[in-house]
Amino acid sequence: VDDVICNTLGAFIGSTSLLIARAIEKSRERVRHTNMTLTTTETQFLHIAKAAISGGDLPAEKVDWPAIFTLANQQKLLPILFEAARATPAAGENAALFAVTKQQVIGQVLNQTVRSAEFADLYRKLRSAGLHPIVVKGQLCSRLYPLKDHRISADDLYISDAEFMACHEQLLANGLTTDTPVDELATADEVSYTKNGSPLYIELHRHLFDSSEDAHDELNHFFTDLKPIEVDGFSTMPPHEHLLYLLLHAYKHFVRSGIGLRQFCDIGLWAWEYHDEIDWQRLHEQCESVHAATFAAAAFRIARDYLGIEFDLPAPWSDAVDAEPLLHDSLCGGVYGSNDLTRLHSSTVTLNAVKASRTGAKSSVLRTVFPKREYLERRYPYLKKRPYLLPVAWVQRIAHYASEKQSGTDNSASGSIKLGKERIELMKRYGIMD
Protein backbone atom coordinates (compact mmCIF):
# COMPACT_ATOMS: atom_id res chain seq x y z
CA VAL A 1 0.00 0.00 0.00
CA ASP A 2 2.86 2.39 0.88
CA ASP A 3 4.40 1.89 -2.59
CA VAL A 4 1.06 2.61 -4.19
CA ILE A 5 0.68 5.79 -2.17
CA CYS A 6 4.19 7.05 -3.00
CA ASN A 7 3.94 6.28 -6.71
CA THR A 8 0.47 7.70 -6.98
CA LEU A 9 1.15 10.89 -5.04
CA GLY A 10 3.89 11.77 -7.50
CA ALA A 11 1.44 11.47 -10.35
CA PHE A 12 -1.14 13.28 -8.27
CA ILE A 13 1.07 16.35 -7.72
CA GLY A 14 1.87 16.57 -11.43
CA SER A 15 -1.75 16.13 -12.40
CA THR A 16 -2.82 18.74 -9.86
CA SER A 17 -0.51 21.36 -11.39
CA LEU A 18 -1.85 20.70 -14.86
CA LEU A 19 -5.45 20.73 -13.72
CA ILE A 20 -5.06 23.96 -11.76
CA ALA A 21 -3.60 25.61 -14.86
CA ARG A 22 -6.45 24.23 -16.92
CA ALA A 23 -9.00 25.43 -14.36
CA ILE A 24 -7.58 28.96 -14.46
CA GLU A 25 -7.68 28.92 -18.26
CA LYS A 26 -11.26 27.68 -18.32
CA SER A 27 -12.39 30.19 -15.69
CA ARG A 28 -11.51 32.98 -18.13
CA GLU A 29 -13.91 31.65 -20.70
CA ARG A 30 -17.39 33.15 -20.61
CA VAL A 31 -19.15 30.63 -22.81
CA ARG A 32 -22.81 30.33 -21.91
CA HIS A 33 -25.52 28.11 -23.31
CA THR A 34 -27.79 30.51 -25.21
CA ASN A 35 -29.83 28.21 -27.45
CA MET A 36 -32.40 26.71 -25.12
CA THR A 37 -35.23 26.62 -27.66
CA LEU A 38 -36.70 23.42 -29.06
CA THR A 39 -35.44 22.11 -32.39
CA THR A 40 -37.80 21.13 -35.22
CA THR A 41 -37.31 17.43 -34.43
CA GLU A 42 -37.96 18.02 -30.72
CA THR A 43 -41.13 19.99 -31.50
CA GLN A 44 -42.42 17.22 -33.77
CA PHE A 45 -41.49 14.61 -31.19
CA LEU A 46 -43.52 16.44 -28.53
CA HIS A 47 -46.47 16.74 -30.93
CA ILE A 48 -46.42 12.97 -31.52
CA ALA A 49 -45.93 12.24 -27.81
CA LYS A 50 -48.95 14.42 -27.00
CA ALA A 51 -51.07 12.50 -29.51
CA ALA A 52 -49.86 9.18 -28.10
CA ILE A 53 -50.50 10.11 -24.45
CA SER A 54 -53.64 12.24 -24.72
CA GLY A 55 -55.04 11.67 -28.20
CA GLY A 56 -55.27 14.10 -31.09
CA ASP A 57 -53.82 14.43 -34.57
CA LEU A 58 -50.23 13.76 -35.56
CA PRO A 59 -48.15 16.42 -37.35
CA ALA A 60 -49.30 17.12 -40.90
CA GLU A 61 -45.89 18.28 -42.06
CA LYS A 62 -43.04 16.03 -43.18
CA VAL A 63 -41.55 14.12 -40.25
CA ASP A 64 -37.99 12.82 -39.92
CA TRP A 65 -39.08 9.41 -38.63
CA PRO A 66 -35.58 7.94 -38.07
CA ALA A 67 -34.75 10.93 -35.86
CA ILE A 68 -38.11 10.69 -34.07
CA PHE A 69 -37.71 6.98 -33.34
CA THR A 70 -34.11 7.49 -32.17
CA LEU A 71 -35.24 10.21 -29.77
CA ALA A 72 -38.17 8.07 -28.59
CA ASN A 73 -35.82 5.18 -27.87
CA GLN A 74 -33.47 7.44 -25.90
CA GLN A 75 -36.46 8.63 -23.88
CA LYS A 76 -37.73 5.06 -23.28
CA LEU A 77 -40.96 6.04 -25.06
CA LEU A 78 -40.58 4.12 -28.31
CA PRO A 79 -43.51 1.69 -27.80
CA ILE A 80 -45.83 4.54 -26.79
CA LEU A 81 -44.97 6.74 -29.78
CA PHE A 82 -44.90 3.87 -32.25
CA GLU A 83 -48.42 2.85 -31.27
CA ALA A 84 -49.65 6.27 -32.39
CA ALA A 85 -47.45 6.44 -35.50
CA ARG A 86 -48.10 2.99 -36.96
CA ALA A 87 -51.69 3.82 -37.96
CA THR A 88 -50.64 6.81 -40.07
CA PRO A 89 -49.87 6.95 -43.82
CA ALA A 90 -46.22 7.37 -42.84
CA ALA A 91 -46.09 3.67 -41.92
CA GLY A 92 -46.70 2.73 -45.54
CA GLU A 93 -44.42 5.41 -46.91
CA ASN A 94 -41.56 4.23 -44.66
CA ALA A 95 -42.34 0.52 -44.65
CA ALA A 96 -38.81 -0.77 -44.05
CA LEU A 97 -38.13 1.60 -41.14
CA PHE A 98 -41.50 0.88 -39.52
CA ALA A 99 -41.03 -2.88 -39.92
CA VAL A 100 -37.66 -2.81 -38.15
CA THR A 101 -38.99 -0.50 -35.44
CA LYS A 102 -42.04 -2.72 -34.94
CA GLN A 103 -39.82 -5.69 -34.13
CA GLN A 104 -37.88 -3.57 -31.66
CA VAL A 105 -41.12 -2.44 -30.01
CA ILE A 106 -42.46 -6.00 -29.79
CA GLY A 107 -39.27 -7.07 -28.03
CA GLN A 108 -39.43 -4.19 -25.55
CA VAL A 109 -43.12 -4.75 -24.75
CA LEU A 110 -42.71 -8.52 -24.34
CA ASN A 111 -39.79 -7.92 -21.97
CA GLN A 112 -41.86 -5.45 -19.97
CA THR A 113 -44.83 -7.84 -19.82
CA VAL A 114 -42.61 -10.60 -18.42
CA ARG A 115 -40.91 -8.14 -16.05
CA SER A 116 -44.28 -6.95 -14.71
CA ALA A 117 -45.60 -10.48 -14.17
CA GLU A 118 -42.42 -11.66 -12.45
CA PHE A 119 -42.33 -8.60 -10.22
CA ALA A 120 -45.95 -9.09 -9.13
CA ASP A 121 -45.21 -12.74 -8.29
CA LEU A 122 -42.05 -11.80 -6.39
CA TYR A 123 -43.87 -9.08 -4.48
CA ARG A 124 -46.51 -11.55 -3.30
CA LYS A 125 -43.73 -13.82 -2.01
CA LEU A 126 -42.13 -10.96 -0.10
CA ARG A 127 -45.44 -10.13 1.56
CA SER A 128 -46.05 -13.81 2.36
CA ALA A 129 -42.67 -13.83 4.12
CA GLY A 130 -43.97 -11.15 6.49
CA LEU A 131 -42.18 -8.22 4.84
CA HIS A 132 -43.70 -4.82 4.09
CA PRO A 133 -41.95 -3.30 1.05
CA ILE A 134 -43.57 -0.21 -0.46
CA VAL A 135 -43.76 -0.05 -4.26
CA VAL A 136 -42.81 3.29 -5.82
CA LYS A 137 -43.08 4.42 -9.46
CA GLY A 138 -42.86 1.43 -11.82
CA GLN A 139 -46.13 -0.44 -12.21
CA LEU A 140 -48.07 2.11 -10.18
CA CYS A 141 -47.33 4.66 -12.90
CA SER A 142 -47.64 2.17 -15.78
CA ARG A 143 -51.28 1.43 -14.92
CA LEU A 144 -52.16 5.06 -15.74
CA TYR A 145 -51.02 4.76 -19.38
CA PRO A 146 -53.32 3.70 -22.24
CA LEU A 147 -51.27 0.48 -22.61
CA LYS A 148 -49.43 -0.21 -19.35
CA ASP A 149 -46.71 -2.52 -20.68
CA HIS A 150 -45.74 0.10 -23.27
CA ARG A 151 -44.16 2.08 -20.41
CA ILE A 152 -40.68 0.57 -20.13
CA SER A 153 -39.14 0.69 -16.67
CA ALA A 154 -37.60 -1.25 -13.81
CA ASP A 155 -39.17 -1.66 -10.36
CA ASP A 156 -38.39 0.04 -7.05
CA LEU A 157 -39.07 -1.09 -3.50
CA TYR A 158 -38.78 1.08 -0.39
CA ILE A 159 -38.40 -0.79 2.88
CA SER A 160 -37.60 0.06 6.48
CA ASP A 161 -34.09 -0.35 7.80
CA ALA A 162 -35.40 -3.01 10.20
CA GLU A 163 -36.58 -5.22 7.32
CA PHE A 164 -33.88 -4.37 4.78
CA MET A 165 -31.60 -7.36 5.36
CA ALA A 166 -34.51 -9.81 5.62
CA CYS A 167 -35.81 -8.52 2.29
CA HIS A 168 -32.32 -8.86 0.81
CA GLU A 169 -32.21 -12.51 1.91
CA GLN A 170 -35.64 -13.18 0.40
CA LEU A 171 -34.58 -11.67 -2.91
CA LEU A 172 -31.52 -13.93 -2.97
CA ALA A 173 -33.69 -16.93 -2.07
CA ASN A 174 -35.87 -16.14 -5.10
CA GLY A 175 -32.95 -16.25 -7.51
CA LEU A 176 -31.93 -12.60 -7.66
CA THR A 177 -28.32 -11.47 -7.32
CA THR A 178 -26.55 -8.20 -6.59
CA ASP A 179 -23.09 -6.78 -7.26
CA THR A 180 -23.12 -4.80 -4.01
CA PRO A 181 -20.38 -6.14 -1.68
CA VAL A 182 -21.65 -7.89 1.46
CA ASP A 183 -19.89 -5.45 3.78
CA GLU A 184 -21.76 -2.51 2.21
CA LEU A 185 -25.27 -3.94 2.60
CA ALA A 186 -25.68 -2.72 6.18
CA THR A 187 -25.37 0.95 5.18
CA ALA A 188 -26.26 1.12 1.47
CA ASP A 189 -29.06 3.55 0.58
CA GLU A 190 -30.08 1.35 -2.33
CA VAL A 191 -29.10 -2.03 -3.73
CA SER A 192 -29.80 -3.20 -7.30
CA TYR A 193 -30.77 -6.78 -8.15
CA THR A 194 -31.06 -8.75 -11.39
CA LYS A 195 -32.08 -12.30 -12.18
CA ASN A 196 -30.26 -14.53 -14.65
CA GLY A 197 -32.40 -15.32 -17.69
CA SER A 198 -35.01 -12.75 -16.66
CA PRO A 199 -35.64 -9.07 -17.52
CA LEU A 200 -36.36 -8.43 -13.83
CA TYR A 201 -34.43 -5.47 -12.39
CA ILE A 202 -35.17 -4.23 -8.88
CA GLU A 203 -33.79 -1.42 -6.77
CA LEU A 204 -34.27 -1.92 -3.03
CA HIS A 205 -34.19 1.39 -1.15
CA ARG A 206 -33.33 1.88 2.50
CA HIS A 207 -33.70 5.62 1.86
CA LEU A 208 -35.49 7.08 -1.15
CA PHE A 209 -32.75 9.68 -1.60
CA ASP A 210 -29.01 9.27 -1.15
CA SER A 211 -28.28 10.07 2.48
CA SER A 212 -24.61 10.78 1.74
CA GLU A 213 -25.45 13.52 -0.78
CA ASP A 214 -25.75 16.91 0.92
CA ALA A 215 -27.88 18.12 -1.99
CA HIS A 216 -30.52 15.40 -1.54
CA ASP A 217 -30.57 14.05 2.02
CA GLU A 218 -32.97 16.83 3.06
CA LEU A 219 -35.62 15.22 0.83
CA ASN A 220 -35.84 12.05 2.92
CA HIS A 221 -37.67 13.64 5.87
CA PHE A 222 -40.88 13.94 3.83
CA PHE A 223 -41.18 10.14 3.77
CA THR A 224 -40.20 9.06 7.29
CA ASP A 225 -43.74 8.57 8.61
CA LEU A 226 -45.70 7.10 5.71
CA LYS A 227 -49.10 5.46 6.12
CA PRO A 228 -49.16 2.97 3.21
CA ILE A 229 -52.30 2.09 1.26
CA GLU A 230 -53.10 -0.86 -1.00
CA VAL A 231 -53.35 -0.31 -4.77
CA ASP A 232 -53.79 -3.24 -7.17
CA GLY A 233 -52.26 -5.63 -4.66
CA PHE A 234 -49.25 -3.41 -3.93
CA SER A 235 -48.51 -1.50 -0.74
CA THR A 236 -47.67 2.07 -1.69
CA MET A 237 -47.62 5.67 -0.52
CA PRO A 238 -50.85 7.69 -0.39
CA PRO A 239 -51.47 9.68 -3.61
CA HIS A 240 -50.23 13.02 -2.22
CA GLU A 241 -46.94 11.60 -0.98
CA HIS A 242 -46.43 9.64 -4.19
CA LEU A 243 -46.85 12.75 -6.33
CA LEU A 244 -44.42 14.58 -4.05
CA TYR A 245 -41.98 11.70 -4.50
CA LEU A 246 -42.34 11.73 -8.30
CA LEU A 247 -41.60 15.47 -8.33
CA LEU A 248 -38.62 15.24 -5.98
CA HIS A 249 -37.25 12.16 -7.75
CA ALA A 250 -37.36 14.09 -11.03
CA TYR A 251 -35.81 17.11 -9.27
CA LYS A 252 -32.98 14.94 -7.91
CA HIS A 253 -32.11 13.59 -11.35
CA PHE A 254 -32.43 17.02 -12.96
CA VAL A 255 -29.88 18.42 -10.50
CA ARG A 256 -27.57 15.49 -11.14
CA SER A 257 -27.45 15.04 -14.91
CA GLY A 258 -30.98 15.35 -16.29
CA ILE A 259 -34.39 13.75 -16.64
CA GLY A 260 -36.47 12.47 -19.52
CA LEU A 261 -39.93 13.20 -20.88
CA ARG A 262 -41.35 10.01 -19.34
CA GLN A 263 -40.94 11.52 -15.87
CA PHE A 264 -43.18 14.42 -16.91
CA CYS A 265 -45.70 11.91 -18.29
CA ASP A 266 -45.72 10.08 -14.94
CA ILE A 267 -46.15 13.32 -12.98
CA GLY A 268 -48.95 14.58 -15.21
CA LEU A 269 -50.90 11.33 -15.29
CA TRP A 270 -50.62 10.97 -11.51
CA ALA A 271 -51.83 14.56 -10.96
CA TRP A 272 -54.73 13.90 -13.34
CA GLU A 273 -55.74 10.57 -11.77
CA TYR A 274 -55.50 11.67 -8.13
CA HIS A 275 -56.15 15.40 -8.45
CA ASP A 276 -58.81 15.58 -5.72
CA GLU A 277 -56.64 13.63 -3.25
CA ILE A 278 -53.72 16.05 -3.51
CA ASP A 279 -53.33 18.88 -0.99
CA TRP A 280 -52.07 21.36 -3.56
CA GLN A 281 -51.28 24.10 -1.03
CA ARG A 282 -49.20 21.73 1.12
CA LEU A 283 -47.52 20.28 -1.98
CA HIS A 284 -46.39 23.77 -2.98
CA GLU A 285 -45.09 24.49 0.52
CA GLN A 286 -43.17 21.20 0.58
CA CYS A 287 -41.57 21.81 -2.81
CA GLU A 288 -40.81 25.43 -1.94
CA SER A 289 -39.03 24.36 1.27
CA VAL A 290 -36.44 22.44 -0.78
CA HIS A 291 -36.09 24.94 -3.67
CA ALA A 292 -38.15 22.75 -6.01
CA ALA A 293 -41.40 24.74 -6.44
CA THR A 294 -40.51 26.46 -9.73
CA PHE A 295 -39.12 23.22 -11.13
CA ALA A 296 -42.33 21.40 -10.12
CA ALA A 297 -44.45 24.16 -11.70
CA ALA A 298 -42.48 23.71 -14.93
CA ALA A 299 -43.05 19.94 -14.76
CA PHE A 300 -46.81 20.50 -14.41
CA ARG A 301 -46.79 22.94 -17.34
CA ILE A 302 -44.97 20.42 -19.54
CA ALA A 303 -47.53 17.76 -18.64
CA ARG A 304 -50.49 20.04 -19.34
CA ASP A 305 -49.38 22.18 -22.28
CA TYR A 306 -46.95 19.92 -24.13
CA LEU A 307 -48.40 16.47 -23.35
CA GLY A 308 -52.08 17.44 -23.25
CA ILE A 309 -52.77 15.93 -19.81
CA GLU A 310 -55.68 18.02 -18.56
CA PHE A 311 -55.90 18.86 -14.86
CA ASP A 312 -56.48 22.06 -12.90
CA LEU A 313 -53.50 23.67 -11.21
CA PRO A 314 -54.86 25.46 -8.12
CA ALA A 315 -53.26 28.49 -6.45
CA PRO A 316 -50.57 29.11 -5.35
CA TRP A 317 -49.25 27.11 -8.31
CA SER A 318 -48.58 29.16 -11.44
CA ASP A 319 -48.33 28.04 -15.05
CA ALA A 320 -46.49 31.20 -16.10
CA VAL A 321 -43.07 29.54 -15.82
CA ASP A 322 -41.15 29.09 -19.09
CA ALA A 323 -40.81 25.31 -19.44
CA GLU A 324 -39.11 25.22 -22.84
CA PRO A 325 -35.48 25.33 -21.57
CA LEU A 326 -36.24 22.44 -19.20
CA LEU A 327 -37.87 20.51 -22.03
CA HIS A 328 -34.91 21.07 -24.33
CA ASP A 329 -32.48 19.91 -21.64
CA SER A 330 -34.60 16.80 -21.02
CA LEU A 331 -34.80 15.87 -24.69
CA CYS A 332 -31.04 16.39 -25.12
CA GLY A 333 -30.16 14.26 -22.11
CA GLY A 334 -32.37 11.19 -22.43
CA VAL A 335 -33.75 9.30 -19.44
CA TYR A 336 -31.86 10.47 -16.32
CA GLY A 337 -29.34 12.35 -18.48
CA SER A 338 -27.79 9.13 -19.71
CA ASN A 339 -27.33 10.00 -23.39
CA ASP A 340 -23.59 10.64 -23.09
CA LEU A 341 -20.74 10.43 -20.61
CA THR A 342 -20.09 14.17 -20.68
CA ARG A 343 -23.52 14.82 -19.22
CA LEU A 344 -23.13 12.07 -16.62
CA HIS A 345 -19.72 13.38 -15.58
CA SER A 346 -21.09 16.94 -15.37
CA SER A 347 -23.11 15.86 -12.33
CA THR A 348 -20.03 16.51 -10.19
CA VAL A 349 -20.19 20.17 -11.21
CA THR A 350 -23.92 20.59 -10.65
CA LEU A 351 -24.05 18.72 -7.34
CA ASN A 352 -21.09 20.70 -6.03
CA ALA A 353 -22.78 23.95 -7.01
CA VAL A 354 -26.12 23.03 -5.42
CA LYS A 355 -24.41 21.95 -2.19
CA ALA A 356 -22.48 25.23 -2.12
CA SER A 357 -25.66 27.25 -2.66
CA ARG A 358 -27.30 25.51 0.32
CA THR A 359 -24.40 26.26 2.68
CA GLY A 360 -23.45 29.69 1.38
CA ALA A 361 -20.06 28.39 0.29
CA LYS A 362 -18.47 29.13 -3.07
CA SER A 363 -18.56 26.46 -5.75
CA SER A 364 -15.07 25.40 -6.82
CA VAL A 365 -13.70 23.95 -10.03
CA LEU A 366 -11.08 22.14 -7.96
CA ARG A 367 -13.80 20.55 -5.83
CA THR A 368 -15.32 19.33 -9.08
CA VAL A 369 -12.06 17.74 -10.21
CA PHE A 370 -11.18 16.49 -6.73
CA PRO A 371 -14.52 15.59 -5.08
CA LYS A 372 -15.00 14.35 -1.54
CA ARG A 373 -14.43 10.72 -0.59
CA GLU A 374 -18.19 10.10 -0.11
CA TYR A 375 -18.86 10.99 -3.75
CA LEU A 376 -16.24 8.54 -5.04
CA GLU A 377 -16.95 5.58 -2.75
CA ARG A 378 -19.35 3.89 -5.17
CA ARG A 379 -16.88 3.93 -8.04
CA TYR A 380 -13.88 3.17 -5.82
CA PRO A 381 -15.11 0.92 -2.96
CA TYR A 382 -11.64 0.64 -1.42
CA LEU A 383 -12.14 4.18 -0.06
CA LYS A 384 -14.62 2.89 2.51
CA LYS A 385 -11.92 0.90 4.30
CA ARG A 386 -8.92 3.04 3.33
CA PRO A 387 -10.05 6.70 3.20
CA TYR A 388 -6.40 7.81 3.12
CA LEU A 389 -6.24 6.50 -0.47
CA LEU A 390 -8.43 9.37 -1.69
CA PRO A 391 -5.53 10.85 -3.75
CA VAL A 392 -5.21 7.46 -5.50
CA ALA A 393 -8.88 7.60 -6.45
CA TRP A 394 -8.46 11.15 -7.75
CA VAL A 395 -5.64 10.06 -10.04
CA GLN A 396 -7.58 7.01 -11.23
CA ARG A 397 -10.51 9.28 -12.01
CA ILE A 398 -8.29 11.69 -13.96
CA ALA A 399 -6.77 8.77 -15.89
CA HIS A 400 -10.28 7.54 -16.68
CA TYR A 401 -11.19 10.93 -18.16
CA ALA A 402 -7.97 10.92 -20.18
CA SER A 403 -8.68 7.47 -21.62
CA GLU A 404 -12.17 8.59 -22.63
CA LYS A 405 -10.74 11.60 -24.45
CA GLN A 406 -8.20 9.43 -26.26
CA SER A 407 -11.00 7.09 -27.36
CA GLY A 408 -12.32 9.91 -29.52
CA THR A 409 -15.57 10.47 -27.64
CA ASP A 410 -16.58 14.00 -26.72
CA ASN A 411 -16.70 13.49 -22.98
CA SER A 412 -13.56 15.12 -21.62
CA ALA A 413 -13.30 16.64 -18.17
CA SER A 414 -13.31 20.16 -19.65
CA GLY A 415 -16.43 19.29 -21.64
CA SER A 416 -18.14 18.06 -18.49
CA ILE A 417 -17.23 21.25 -16.63
CA LYS A 418 -18.56 23.38 -19.51
CA LEU A 419 -21.84 21.47 -19.65
CA GLY A 420 -22.10 21.58 -15.87
CA LYS A 421 -21.82 25.38 -15.94
CA GLU A 422 -24.52 25.58 -18.60
CA ARG A 423 -26.82 23.42 -16.49
CA ILE A 424 -26.11 25.53 -13.39
CA GLU A 425 -27.53 28.52 -15.29
CA LEU A 426 -30.59 26.41 -16.03
CA MET A 427 -30.99 25.56 -12.34
CA LYS A 428 -30.83 29.23 -11.44
CA ARG A 429 -33.61 29.85 -13.95
CA TYR A 430 -35.82 27.37 -12.07
CA GLY A 431 -35.03 28.62 -8.58
CA ILE A 432 -32.95 25.63 -7.51
CA MET A 433 -29.98 27.92 -6.94
CA ASP A 434 -29.74 31.63 -6.20
Stretch-by-stretch model annotation:
Residues D3, D155-D156:
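Acidic Asp/Glu-based divalent-cation binding sites
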Residues V31-S153, I159-D434:
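Conserved NTP-donor binding/palm subdomain of two-metal-ion nucleotidyltransferases/polymerases, i.e.
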Residues V1-L18:
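Alpha-helical transmembrane segments that form the membrane-embedded catalytic/substrate-binding core
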Residues A21, E25-R30:
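Membrane-interfacial segments
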